[in-house]
Structures are given as C-alpha cells and as structure tokens.
Amino acid sequence: MTIAESSQKSATRKPDSMEPILRLNNIEKSLQDTRDYRGLQLENGLKVLLISDPNTDVSAAALSVQVGHMSDPTNLPGLAHFCEHMLFLGTEKYPHENGYTTYLSQSGGSSNAATYPLMTKYHFHVAPDKLDGALDRFAQFFIAPLFTPSATEREINAVNSEHEKNLPSDLWRIKQVNRHLAKPDHAYSKFGSGNKTTLSEIPKSKNIDVRDELLKFHKQWYSANIMCLAVIGKESLDELEGMVLEKFSEIENKNVKVPGWPRHPYAEERYGQKVKIVPIKDIRSLTISFTTDDLTQFYKSGPDNYLTHLIGHEGKGSILSELRRLGWCNDLMAGHQNTQNGFGFFDIVVDLTQEGLEHVDDIVKIVFQYLEMLRKEGPKKWIFDECVKLNEMRFRFKEKEQPENLVTHAVSSMQIFPLEEVLIAPYLSNEWRPDLIKGLLDELVPSKSRIVIVSQSFEPDCDLAEPYYKTKYGITRVAKDTVQSWENCELNENLKLALPNSFIPTNFDISDVPADAPKHPTIILDTPILRVWHKQDNQFNKPKACMTFDMSNPIAYLDPLNCNLNHMMVMLLKDQLNEYLYDAELASLKLSVMGKSCGIDFTIRGFSDKQVVLLEKLLDHLFDFSIDEKRFDILKEEYVRSLKNFKAEQPYQHSIYYLALLLTENAWANMELLDAMELVTYDRVLNFAKEFFQRLHTECFIFGNVTKQQATDIAGRVNTRLEATNASKLPILARQMLKKREYKLLAGDSYLFEKENEFHKSSCAQLYLQCGAQTDHTNIMVNLVSQVLSEPCYDCLRTKEQLGYIVFSGVRKVNGANGIRIIVQSAKHPSYVEDRIENFLQTYLQVIEDMPLDEFERHKEALAVKKLEKPKTIFQQFSQFYGEIAMQTYHFEREEAEVAILRKISKADFVDYFKKFIAKDGEERRVLSVHIVSQQTDENATSEAEPVEITNMERHKPISDIVTFKSCKELYPIALPFLDIKAKGARSKL
C-alpha cells in the first residue's frame, strides 16, 4: 500500500472561482498501482475521483447519483428508471437524440447506465483523445436534459419492452414477490422497472403528464451534492481537474438530503412465514432471509464478512458439505447486502435437490445448528486474521482494472466510503470487533427469519399472484413446534469451523526473465500425446500464472449419448473436487473445468506459488476417476432440468442457438441430448471416463510467473500420467482432432428458419449475412461494417422505431467463417421486424455513399483503437494468446496485421464491399434469417392489432428440415495456421 503523490499545480489553472473546495492527493492505492489519483469536492458539492494513466489506451468516466427507484413517486412506478433512459436522448447543448452515442461510436467507445433501488449509474468509455468531447456531452445529462415530448412518448415503449423481456425471468419474478410482501407504505415494496401501464396508461387516465413528472424528478433529485464522478484519462491530474471543473461545475446543488429508510421493510407477521413461489423454469431453491440494520458504518471491521465467510464456506464441516452428504443440496450461497440507508438483508440461499425439497425444515434446522455452533465457539481471531491476510494479499497484487470497470466501481464506493479510502475500503476489514460479530449473529435467529421456497411443484397450492409479473405464490406459517425445534436445536457433530487455509501463498517472488525471452508463446515439448506451449510474462510483473490443459478424445462428441456422458463426467469431476478447491479459490487460486466438443478443458489461474499442488490433486482425480452413485443421480437430474429449461430462455438466445445449429458442421440439438439422457447410467459414465482417459491428446499452455524450466517440470508431471495410459501405444491422430467447420451459403442464397416459442411475449428476428472465410482482410472488413452500422442501427430500430429493447448488430466469427448479424427482440412479428431491418440497410447504403471522408476516417480510427487495446491483466493476455492456440491459427499479432490492412481501406473499397455483401440486392449477398415467433397473445389488448405490410418474405426459401438443409451445403475450409506449425497429434503412417 502507498500514498498517491501530490502533483504540482498546472500553470493553466482555472480562475479561483472554479477552484474545488477540497483536493485530496492521499488516495490509498495498491503498491503496484502505477496510476495517479486525486480526490476533489467541487463548490457545488460534487465528489470527484481523477485517475491519470499516461499509458491508457482507453479513457472512461462514470457518474452515480444517490437516488434510485425506491424514490419513485407512489403514483408513477418506474419513473427513476424512465429518467435514466431519457437522459441519453438529447440535451439543450447537444439536442440530437443520438448525438452522444454517435460521438462515442465514432470515437471507439460506448455507454450504458443502470437504475438500482438507491442509486443510478451512468458510464462510458472512449478513445483517449476524445475524452474532452465525451465529458462535455456527458455532463449535460445532469445540467440540461431535454425530455422532448416525442422522445418521451417513444421511450416508454423501450422501458416496456425491457420489462416484457424480464417477465419470464425467475430472478426478477422472485425479487418482485419479496418486494410485494413488504409493508405497502415502505419504499422497498415499489415496482422499480416500470412499464407502459404504470408510465403511460394509468397516468393518462388520471391526467398526469409524465413528461412534467420526469422534469420534476430530475429537478428534485439530480443534485450535485449527492453525485459522485470518476474520470480516467491519459492527461495529467491537473489537466483532468481542469476538464471536470469546466464541465461539471454547472450541475446545480439543490442541497438534497439522501433519502433513508430506518424502518425495516417487513411487518412483524412476515417473520415465521413460509413463502412458496412457482417459477417459470424448473428450479428449486430455499432462501432463509434475515432483515438487519444497515452495517455500512462497520466496513473496517466487517462483521458481515466474517459470518459470510463461515456460513458460505464449502469445505469439510460446512453447511454445504453436510447438506451434500445428505443428498439435499447442490450449492449454497450466503451474504449480506446493505441498503446503505437504513436496513440490510443477510440471506442464505440453498439450491435444492428433489429430495432436499422434501426436507426443507430439516435443512433450515441444520443452518440454525451451524449458527448455534458459531455462538458456542465464539468469534475466532485466527479466522478473522486469515480473512485480513487474504484481503491484504488481494489488494497488494490487485490486477489493473479495465478503465470503465474502474470508474463504475469507484462511483459506487464514493457514495459509501471516504474519498481517500475509495480504492482500499472493500479490502479494509481489519479492525477486530468480536462484539459486532456476536451482535449480528444474535440477529440470525428463527423468530427474525423469512423462509422462501421456489419450486414448480407448488403450483396447486399457490392461489395468490404478484400484480406486475403475475407470479403465483402462497403463504403459510411455520408450525410452532418446528420453530421451537429450530430455536432449541442441539449441536450437530458434523458441523465444524473451517480449518486453516493451506493454499494461502507465501512466496511472492517474481522469476527473472531471460533477455532473449521470446515475444510470443513457443512450443517447449511436442510428442504424439502431449504438446506444451510456454510464455514467461515480462509485462505485468505479478506473482501470478495461468495454465490450461486441453484434453482431446474424439469419442467425446461421437453422438448425443457420448456428448452427455462427457458432460456428466465433467459435472462429477467438479463435484468431487468442490470441497478441496474452495480453500484454493479463497486464496485467489481458481480451477475451472469445462466440457467441450473434443473432450475437457481445465484452467488453473491465480497466484503461482501453490499451482503445482492443485495440479497434482487434479491429475489424481482425472486418472483415478470414481463416482459416488448418489451424487450421480442428483447431478443427472440437474443436467436434465437444465436441458429442459432452455425452452424458457430469451427469444434472442434461441435465435443464436438455432443459427449455430444450422451452420455448424456437427452440432447436437438440445432435444437430441435430452432424448439420449434416458440411456445415461452410472456404469456408462464410469466406463466412458475410463475409455476417455486411456487414450488422450493433451495440449497445454503455461503463461505468467513461470520459467521455462518450471514449465518443463509441469509438462513432465503431466507426461508421466499420460504415458501410463494407452495413449502412447495408440495416440490420437491429427485428423481425428480437426476443428469444426461452417456450412457455406452461396451468393444469392436467402433462407428462413422459423421456430415457435410459448414462454415469451416477445418474438425475435435475426438477419445473418454470411461474408466468407476468415482472412485478415475479411475479418477487418466485417468489423468495419459492424463499426459503421452499430450506432445508427440501434438509433433507427430501437430509439426511433421502438421495435424493442434488445437491438444488436455485430460480427459472427466462428468455425472459420465471418458474417454480420442484426438481432431485434420485439413484440412485433419477426417478418415485420426483418422488413424494417432491410429498410434500414437499404436507407443506410445511401448514407454510407454520402458519408464525408473525415467521418469515414473517424470510424476507421475508432475501430483501430478497439483492435489495438492492450490486455490489462495476466489472464486477459493469457486468453488472447490461448485463443490463437486453441483455434490452431497461431496468429499472435493478428490485431496489428488487421489494423495495417484497415489503414489502407478506402471509402470506395468499403462502399463496394457493403454493396456486394450487405445491401439488399448485392451480388455476393448470402442470407439466413432466423425467426422466433411468440405464441402468446396480449391479454390487455382492447382491439385487434392493425395489419402491417410485409414486403420481403417471399424471397426466402424456408428451411423445414435441418438435416436436408445441411445435406446440400458445402463447408468452408478450416482457417490455416499463420505460423508453419504442424497440426497437433500423431502423424499418420499412410
């Protein structure tokens, strides 16, 4: 930890009237943090964090205002959220509705915002030399927004579309039931999203002018004294200070008092109740919720963090360990959430098995047995000290945050913590206060708990409905004798305190990097059964590393049955390792295990000190694979539910899924996997695992604080295990591990695939324009098309035409092929939506042809900025390198090569490409359109919808059978490697 040094005052200081009333140069930061920080408070009360990073390739800013949807007027639910939407749509100084987003888009940036119960946050990122202009536009949100009548009327549709997107989301539904059950006069009970009914229809019926209410809300609450701003740029602190003073001093200080809610949200009768909720998806969960006082002031002692650490622990002796042993649960989470303004919740959430659902009272009792054990044991200083040590270690070696993430996190922390502690405060719980731990523990008792259970099996018993989402729920009181058994529970001998964490690293030395160290990953071992890549980090200078192992066996994706067996093997492996891995994860050492079409992939990342210990444990499990039959049954049922639940995912996700199913060479459909699950047995998984691990090819990449000698030693450990199998006798051939390929559409092709959906009100249209095989030139050209189209597409289809909340345009780059896709999720029929997409493309062709040369060059530069943005962390650099290795392309300087081509693209080249591949009658145009059609009808509709004219569907050839479609299509070639490296695996002797 160190103190940011004071900087000298700039010679071009603003007049004294523009001086801040407070300037702090003692912002506590991590020892290795090279950025400079300064805190300010302006005369209008605005708190500011300035971050100077001369080497940044992205600038960013965020602003939080400490008002959210809990401050909505009672007669206008959703007004705070609506206000957030409207600020993007024009200000007095910059009146064009899309002026802000256009500026950002042409400057390599983008923006977003979110409304929370107590806070609203706005943020953006942009090319460094465009920060000044972006800040000027951003500041006007909070000074003089327009709220034009036209935009107000239209944007209500976007808010409503966002709400309709969330209607089938169990997360939103359950949250709103909990709010609905709060005291009706408490702000926590409000409906924060808003919809057309609450923001248009009801207000109109009561002669309420919503635009006037928006203006009043902004005027009342958007006050500088409850705002926090964070800015990061390449400029000096003095230069950044000058920019902020000039642009943000105009925000009015209305001396707003931050709203607070010291009363708890639930009436006394709500405690001791069981709330049963019927979900859309087949999920089962139990939540034990305790309402607490606001604990924000105790951030330096963190009593909630101490209890969260123990109650949510996953090692031996934990609640989760005991519930898994009994077969009642798969997962458990615990944590405290402060409102920061009066109250909070301590929640324990249990993911239930089918058997667990029948033992809810027993599970709750086990939780209270654990809490009773904690009371009897009392707070332990050594456990607290271990948590302090972990936090100090995380802060000391904190990775460099992405600029936009940094400022977005900062403006939240600035609302809570002193400015000088804004960076360190989340890691600062180092004051030992056992009295606070005991006090909080005394609040976690049966008489102060709410029990919420979620399961589809409750449908017959639930006769109540939440008004906004229509979620069915029911309420019963917990029997008195049950409550008494919880209150007077005996200790459970299986529940114990966590043991000391053996994974906490002790060696933080950075290995010396040889002067002749290669710039890119190189192969240090290559045999028919094992290929090892290595690159020692010489950039981030942290005691961290990443290593990944890609284990391939062609049996993994042979058919839907084997695909399921592979998936089950991975699930069981992760399940077996869970207790052991939890301590490692607490010590910032993470293992991820993933199934993939060619087998499994596992990655270890974090502090380099104990990685080999974790690797050895993993190898033991891999090559001596065993299965607990009870856990097999539980995990099989969980996997089947996940396959069935796919049908309730968002329509846009379905459109993406079906496009991949249509174009990928070999892809098993969800229904094919579901049918094959009937054949998945305990013995089959066991036999599959034995066969899989007996004949493998493994590709490994080791990156970070690892020398070549250390990497060679790791390779030797893996090789020893592989040589003990049959892999060395009969290795996997290179041609058994060829990458998947993409089906090729021909010039002039235009196909339509249509699928019905009964779970969502919204439909979805995806227009996919295939653009050819991946090459540096094609890659950068489709990226440039995406760059130029993105903002105007959003502005036209979402902001102006209000087709729906989800509007996306971008590149689809998979399986060696490139393309552009436009996705719109809408209440309107996909055929109509596609017609509007085509109309936009046709209209925009003329815009591109008439585009001034300087505007086209701005787009090129914006794309170059995005492409050349450097990885900020070891893991990001590792992922970039490994992406090339996994795809077997080895083009480690791809971004630089593509940008070199980009610099040479003329406007005429671009217009010609757009006309050929994107425009409606382009000679090279290849279209595959996917429509997801809602089968729901609008229950609130008072008249039949007006018919809309659809002009472009007759040119599509419908796809009625996926197999038939694929049977008559060629495949694109696999992208060839950039470097002359032979394909991994054994060479054929033919």
Swiss-Prot record:
It is an enzyme of class 3 (hydrolase). One of its GO terms (biological process) is proteolysis. GO terms for cellular component: cytoplasm; cytosol; mitochondrion; peroxisome; plasma membrane. Its cofactor is Zn(2+). Optimum pH is 7-8. Induction: Inhibited by bacitracin and sulfhydryl-specific reagents. Binds 1 zinc ion per subunit. GO terms for molecular function: metal ion binding; metalloendopeptidase activity; metallopeptidase activity. Keywords: Hydrolase, Metal-binding, Metalloprotease, Protease, Zinc. Zn(2+) binds at residues 81, 85, 162. InterPro entries: Metalloenz_LuxS/M16 (IPR011249), Pept_M16_N (IPR011765), Pept_M16_Zn_BS (IPR001431), Peptidase_M16 (IPR050626), Peptidase_M16_C (IPR007863), Peptidase_M16_M (IPR032632). It comes from the Eukaryota. Gene3D superfamilies: Metalloenzyme, LuxS/M16 peptidase-like. Can cleave insulin and TGF-alpha. Belongs to the peptidase M16 family. This is Insulin-degrading enzyme. It comes from Drosophila melanogaster. The gene is Ide.
